[in-house]
């Protein structure tokens, strides 16, 4: 799941989209999916912390057995985290971008695929459920995990996916409602999986792009019954789809190998766009009425980013020399990041690159405001950035977070660090006035001590 230059396709993909709808009320106190309610990574909440350390402003921290790069999700007093425990020996994580992370052989030790529920106020584990015990069905990249998909919740149930294993539904008391088995498929170079399911209405959608048989799957969220499944041409990818609701319709936007495809809620193709890189990780999202889609595999010459208007039909592919058309407002073939998703704040689109540089563009025109400015020194970046209170937060794989002003120039305000043994590939979650950071060993709840 990482790239040929290998990093983790993982957490960033690890990922979700669009407001899950249910009897539960979606508020800024909840963070029901990857990158939040609207998948933008932006919170309008106030009172959130911008300073922390391994002790400062740490309300609690809880050790999590096993390994998983999926983000925490939050609803009410519940924090949900997926993990897989290897009863044998797990190879140490190697941070950064590199060759040599392929692991062709499937581990033969027994693993446990688990979903945990933690108490938001204390970090206490309220319940832990094992959905499978056995030998893995696939190999994964050294930097991937068997729990890189982020759960999604509608306030009544939580849905978790373990790629090549299955989709599972639990109520908030930990009782399993249903399961749907996923067949094991080959993935690119044996890197594994990471794309997360998404919710809309009473339907759970899952993109299963692999090297055998790629599909878009729709399940009844209450029963797990398959409603429909459509074949896709794309091969292995790790991008979570996005449910885009606008005045014209609701559609399912999927970013994939060299192409973007959007479907209606019955799986019929609405439009497509060629011109992505060969590996896609970032989840699409909408800001200020435009859809932003990016893919920037580091070994490909094309690192495309598109800003797209709603209402498109047919083939949106740009002709040679074009950077826009009737529905593509602007685009660039050279500016997309690889693992991290982009983020829009107050008319500015920020791009965090894996090697620790940041660029900023006018989100409505694509005009550059600043480009390739360096952040803190240290390891690479896999987690997607997040934003609140006029600030942008970028955390690297060492757990060092650069806090910067979200402005027209790069202004780094300060940096925050976690424990020396923490490895941070997961994108954090925001709930109320709390920031939840997952590392390879634990979950931190960061909150201003005065609150």
Please state what every model-predicted region is:
Residues 21-451:
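Noncatalytic, solvent-exposed loop/strand surfaces
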Residues 6-18:
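Bacterial N-terminal signal peptides
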Residues 1-4:
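N-terminal secretory signal peptides that target proteins for export/translocation
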């Amino acid at each position: 799941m990482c790239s040929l230059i290998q990093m983790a396709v993982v957490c960033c993909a690890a990922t979700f989209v669009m407001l899950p709808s249910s009897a539960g009320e979606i508020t800024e106190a909840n963070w029901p999916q990857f990158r939040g309610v609207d998948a933008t990574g932006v919170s309008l909440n106030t009172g959130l912390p911008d300073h922390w350390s391994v002790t400062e402003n740490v309300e609690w921290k809880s050790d999590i057995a096993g390994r998983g790069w999926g983000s925490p999700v939050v609803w009410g007093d519940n924090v949900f985290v997926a993990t897989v425990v290897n009863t044998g020996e797990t190879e140490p994580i190697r941070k950064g971008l590199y060759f040599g992370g392929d692991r062709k052989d499937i581990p033969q030790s027994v693993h446990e695929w688990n979903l945990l529920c933690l108490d938001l106020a204390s970090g206490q584990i309220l319940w832990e459920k094992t959905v499978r015990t056995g030998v893995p069905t696939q190999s994964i990249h050294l930097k991937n995990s068997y729990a890189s998909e982020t759960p999604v919740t509608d306030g009544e149930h939580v849905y978790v996916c373990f790629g090549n294993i299955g989709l599972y539904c639990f109520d908030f008391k930990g009782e399993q409602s249903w399961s749907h088995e996923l067949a094991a498929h080959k993935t690119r170079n044996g890197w594994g999986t990471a794309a997360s399911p998404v919710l809309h209405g009473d339907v759970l959608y899952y993109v299963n792009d692999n090297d055998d048989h790629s599909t878009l799957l729709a399940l009844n969220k209450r029963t797990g019954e398959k409603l429909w499944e459509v074949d896709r041409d794309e091969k292995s990818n790790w991008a979570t789809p996005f449910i885009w609701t606008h005045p014209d319709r609701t559609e399912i936007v999927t970013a994939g190998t060299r192409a973007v495809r959007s479907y209606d809620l019955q799986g019929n193709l609405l439009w497509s766009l060629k011109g992505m890189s060969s590996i896609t990780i970032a989840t699409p999202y909408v800001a200020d009425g435009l859809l932003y889609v990016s893919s920037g595999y580091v070994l490909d010459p094309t690192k495309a980013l598109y800003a797209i208007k709603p209402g498109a039909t047919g083939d949106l592919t740009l002709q040679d020399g074009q950077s826009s058309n009737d529905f593509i407002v602007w685009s660039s073939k050279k500016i997309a990041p690889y693992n991290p998703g982009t983020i829009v704040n107050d008319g500015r689109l920020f791009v965090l690159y894996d090697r620790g540089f940041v660029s900023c563009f006018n989100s409505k025109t694509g005009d550059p405001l600043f480009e390739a400015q360096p952040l803190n020194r240290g390891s690479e970046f896999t987690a997607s950035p997040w934003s609140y209170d006029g600030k942008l937060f970028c955390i690297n794989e060492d757990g060092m977070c650069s806090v910067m002003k979200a402005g027209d120039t790069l202004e780094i305000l300060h940096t925050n660090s976690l424990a020396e043994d923490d490895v941070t590939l997961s994108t954090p979650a925001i709930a109320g006035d709390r920031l939840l950071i997952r590392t390879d060993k634990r979950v931190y709840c960061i909150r201003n001590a005065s609150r």
